[in-house]
Amino acid sequence: MAQLLSDVEIQSQASKLSGWTLEGSKLQTTRKFKDFIEAIAFVNKLVEPAESAGHHPDIEISYNKVKVTLTTHDAGGLTQKDFDVAATISQIN
């Protein structure tokens, strides 16, 4: 099981990510697209990196908006995996 990060580690990692916010024990970003088709295309681009990492985000789709939430459920909070996947997602257009 992945090890939980300390509050100091979480703040340090979060400061390196643009467009992500800490919401309790979760890391979140919301992306806005031109339309539903572009939003779904973005979600489809998340499949490969999530599968490769063995770490899957929670995803909410609302027409042209996609909210991505990361947390390590089995550890009960944020781990390095969450920040690694967030960094990868940040590079996806």
UniProtKB/Swiss-Prot annotation:
Source superkingdom: Bacteria
MF annotations from Gene Ontology: 4-alpha-hydroxytetrahydrobiopterin dehydratase activity
Any GO BP annotation: tetrahydrobiopterin biosynthetic process
Signal peptide stretch: none
InterPro entries associated with the record: PCD_sf, Pterin_deHydtase
Gene3D superfamilies per record: Transcriptional coactivator/pterin dehydratase
Transmembrane portions of the chain: none
EC annotation from Swiss-Prot or TrEMBL: 4.2.1.96
Catalytic activity reported: (4aS,6R)-4a-hydroxy-L-erythro-5,6,7,8-tetrahydrobiopterin = (6R)-L-erythro-6,7-dihydrobiopterin + H2O
Keyword terms, alphabetized: Lyase
SUPFAM superfamilies: PCD-like (SSF55248)
EC top class named in words: lyase
Family classification: Belongs to the pterin-4-alpha-carbinolamine dehydratase family.
PANTHER family listed in its UniProt record: PTERIN-4-ALPHA-CARBINOLAMINE DEHYDRATASE
NCBIfam families in the cross-refs: PRK00823.1-2 (NF002017)
Protein name from the UniProt record: Putative pterin-4-alpha-carbinolamine dehydratase
Biological source species: Nostoc sp. (strain PCC 7120 / SAG 25.82 / UTEX 2576)
Taxonomic classification: Bacteria, Bacillati, Cyanobacteriota, Cyanophyceae, Nostocales
